[in-house]
């Protein structure tokens, strides 16, 4: 595990550790740390956290190369590089780039990171390809796609096998990733949740996304079928990585990232929000 001893890192950890409980985290967004560096560290097995304070990126390592999930903003790429290098790894050893969904805070820097890696393969869920290609790159780069994924397809590198699950709603191609890792002689199921249901989401009468309510309902149903040991996500407020990292740094056992109850609470809260939003918006649909 790589832990920063700098005062800045300690202040960041202390500040983020007071994030809301998992039962409420889904609806409380804190974007103040999106562009702030956070100590890279081992989560479990061959899974490492290399994101910022509230935008989460994950590295799955192997002797054959690494898989990166989420590149985030172009302006946060220096933080990503530093996070990877502090683990004793190289950007050029990243062979595959994946994403949670086609929003700039998770995939804007994909073209830039592909160049830095020397040509890592970029893979995107089919339904998100149009939105991903339309992402504005501040540096003017064209977003690349080397492989288009379908629901249930697997991405393999070395001994790592990641399965892409279509969980639409946040975007049409919102992708939840699952895998199994080994740690301490045991197997652990890992899930990286794609995106949550915002408390101000327009589910009824959404002209830009007419299927959004049904898509979220389908995704909630699918999320209920998963039983992960390790719950990760694209945003920090879903699962409190700062608090878990702080406890992990102090030698807490079992590993604080083992949190099946936190995952179940997140799914239950999403379903509760969906029911409330649909009921409320049916009473007052948007004006034509």
Where are these regions (language model features)?
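Boundary at the C-terminal end of the N-terminal hydrophobic targeting segment
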Residues: 23-25
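Conserved beta-strand hairpin/beta-sheet module of binuclear metal-dependent hydrolase folds
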Residues: 33-87, 176-197
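C-terminal regulatory/interaction regions
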Residues: 260-288
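Divalent metal-coordination and catalytic microenvironments
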Residues: 46, 60, 70, 101, ...
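Active-site HxH/HxHxD metal-binding segment of metal-dependent hydrolases
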Residues: 75-78, 85-154, 266
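Metallo-beta-lactamase
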Residues: 66, 73-75, 145, 154-156, ...
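Bacterial N-terminal signal peptides
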Residues: 9-21
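Bacterial N-terminal signal peptides that target proteins for export
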Residues: 1-11
């Amino acid at each position: 595990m790589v832990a920063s001893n700098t005062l800045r890192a300690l202040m960041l950890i202390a500040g983020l550790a007071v994030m809301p409980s998992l039962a409420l985290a889904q609806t409380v967004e804190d974007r103040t740390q999106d562009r702030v560096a956070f100590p890279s560290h081992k989560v479990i097995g061959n899974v490492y956290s290399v994101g910022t304070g509230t935008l989460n990126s994950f590295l799955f390592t192997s002797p054959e190369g690494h898989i990166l999930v989420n590149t985030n903003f172009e302006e946060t790429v220096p933080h990503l590089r530093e996070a990877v290098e502090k683990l004793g790894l190289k950007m050029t050893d990243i062979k595959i780039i994946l994403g949670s969904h086609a929003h700039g805070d998770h995939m804007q820097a994909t073209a830039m990171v592909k160049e830095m890696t020397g040509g890592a393969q970029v893979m995107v869920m089919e339904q998100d390809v149009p939105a991903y290609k339309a992402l504005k790159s501040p540096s003017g780069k064209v977003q690349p796609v080397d492989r288009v994924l379908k629901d249930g397809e697997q991405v393999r590198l070395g001994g790592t096998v990641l399965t892409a699950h279509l969980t639409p709603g946040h975007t049409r191609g919102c992708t939840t990733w699952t895998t199994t890792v080994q740690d301490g002689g045991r197997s652990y199921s890992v899930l990286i949740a794609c995106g949550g249901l915002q408390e101000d989401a327009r589910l009824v009468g959404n002209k830009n996304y007419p299927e959004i309510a049904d898509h979220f309902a389908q995704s909630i149903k699918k999320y209920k079928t998963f039983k992960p040991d390790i719950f990760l996500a694209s945003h920090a407020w879903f699962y409190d990585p700062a608090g878990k990292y702080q406890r992990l740094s102090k030698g807490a056992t079992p590993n604080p990232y083992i949190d099946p109850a936190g995952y179940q609470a997140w799914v239950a809260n999403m379903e509760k929000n969906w029911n409330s939003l649909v009921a409320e918006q049916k009473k007052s649909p948007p004006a034509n």
